[in-house]
């Protein structure tokens, strides 16, 4: 399990504490929280934890370091990440692994957001899901990050991730939503 403390960690701590009051989350890394969750709910533990990363890019590079340090060869990696950040995580991994490594994306949920009167809400309840405002905030931050331009994380910008094709309909929807929600 990979995850230190980043921009979503405090919210994750609150959600875990609310859903599982017996799991103490104060000052825990994301990996430590998921380890405690696995132990509490399923009675099992991960073999390895990476707890120092502070962002999606570190998650990838520190994961690869962990695999190398423990002499763990791989031909494929399953990425199971918060769906709002799944595509960026895969693009980060793609930047650092060889072309013959298979990246399997397994988003941990699939959320549909609908209009509920004057507000947004989830079409279905998803256990442990972000509050809708936080989810929209996360989503609105992803398109600028995924962009391969001078401001984005792609090779033409900060070069944190591999190139990602963003469909035109997604770009148009983002521009429309930005007028209401801002870009982050």
Positions of predicted regions on the chain:
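Conserved donor sugar-nucleotide recognition element shared by glycan-biosynthetic enzymes
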Residues: 14, 27-31, 56-59
